[in-house]
């Protein structure tokens, strides 16, 4: 081809955004955006075809080529499939100060404080609970501060069975603006895009009546967000870029708020898909145990 194009990833296709003429096997591009990952491509009768390895043009103008190393394998812990944006961060902080409480009285009088959320984040969290010495029938998330008790999902895991324990949803009866889509049941519906939005700015709460005292070993929760964290029960598939195409590293059904992959080629470009729901997905590299989206 007389021309080479540079493409960027646009969920889920590569879209050419710049071109240059090839002279003596060299194509020179000018005025490219920095801190961007590009893929060299050409147009053929079969459509867009990669003609080189993806690379990052850093903020300092350095070119860093991305090549998967199949000889050096790594483990990978994944929490998201799409980058985090400011509008999500502005909501997620509301989880700060919330408390998980347990009691055997429906009024929650003399309740035991199980855990206080002292740091905010946009991904799900697991709380491992040591043996308490007592079992409790009523468990809840209580938010004393100005947050409307915003939470997307709560899961209570029983100690003996190590399985999710399901009871009767309890909590404040109404939501903000009386929106039926944000009632207390939304905190237990398995959908990360729905959330409880208490009618009270402070003092909101939501939880479970298990019908009898239970021993909970773990609480898993996800703050209100964008639905792009890992959803329990959803099926995911991880891909990596090799030999000019995406190759699968296997499917998993999420049992908690993160995915664990082993024997992953290191130094590469990756792509996580939710096969159950959702459309927003983004490529990433993996640096120092963290996903870096492009």
Name each model-derived stretch.
Residues 2-13, 93-98, 151:
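Short, ordered, surface-exposed loop/turn motifs in non-cytosolic proteins
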Residues 2-3, 35-36, 41, 60-62, ...:
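Glycine-centered loop/turn motifs
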Residues 16-17, 53-55, 115-118, 128-129, ...:
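Beta-strand-rich interaction surfaces with strong enrichment in secreted/lumenal proteins
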Residues 70-110, 121-251, 255-294:
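Aromatic, loop-rich ligand-recognition surfaces of beta-strand-rich domains
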Residues 44-71, 284-294:
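Structured interaction patches on ligand/partner-binding surfaces of diverse proteins
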Residues 22-31, 257-262:
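Short, surface-exposed beta-strand/beta-hairpin micro-motifs centered on an aromatic residue
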Residues 11-24:
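Short, acidic Ser/Thr/Gly-rich low-complexity loop/linker segments typical of extracellular
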């Amino acid at each position: 081809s007389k021309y080479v194009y540079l493409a960027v990833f646009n969920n889920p296709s590569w879209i050419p955004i710049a071109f240059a003429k090839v002279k003596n096997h060299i194509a020179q591009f000018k005025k490219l955006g920095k801190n961007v990952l590009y893929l060299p491509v050409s147009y053929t009768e079969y459509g867009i075809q990669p003609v080189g390895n993806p690379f990052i043009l850093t903020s300092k103008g350095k070119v860093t080529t991305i090549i998967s190393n199949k000889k050096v394998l790594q483990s990978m812990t994944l929490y998201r499939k799409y980058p985090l944006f400011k509008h999500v961060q502005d909501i997620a902080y509301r989880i700060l100060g919330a408390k998980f409480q347990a009691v055997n009285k429906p009024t929650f009088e003399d309740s035991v404080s199980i855990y206080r959320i002292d740091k905010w984040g946009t991904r799900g969290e697991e709380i491992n609970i040591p043996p308490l010495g007592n079992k409790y029938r009523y468990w809840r998330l209580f938010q004393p501060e100005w947050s409307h008790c915003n939470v997307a999902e709560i899961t209570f895991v029983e100690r003996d069975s190590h399985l999710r324990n399901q009871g009767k949803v309890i909590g404040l009866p109404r939501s903000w603006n009386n929106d039926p889509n944000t009632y207390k049941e939304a905190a237990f519906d398995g959908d990360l895009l729905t959330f409880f939005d208490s009618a009270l700015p402070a003092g909101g709460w939501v939880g479970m009546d298990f019908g009898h005292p239970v021993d909970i070993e773990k609480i898993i929760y996800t703050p209100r967000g964008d639905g792009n964290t890992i959803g329990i029960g959803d099926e995911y598939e991880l891909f990596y870029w090799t030999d000019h195409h995406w190759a699968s590293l296997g499917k998993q059904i999420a049992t908690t708020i993160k995915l664990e992959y082993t024997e992953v080629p290191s130094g590469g470009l990756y792509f996580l898909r939710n096969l159950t729901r959702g459309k927003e997905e983004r490529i990433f590299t993996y640096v120092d145990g963290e996903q870096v989206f492009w």
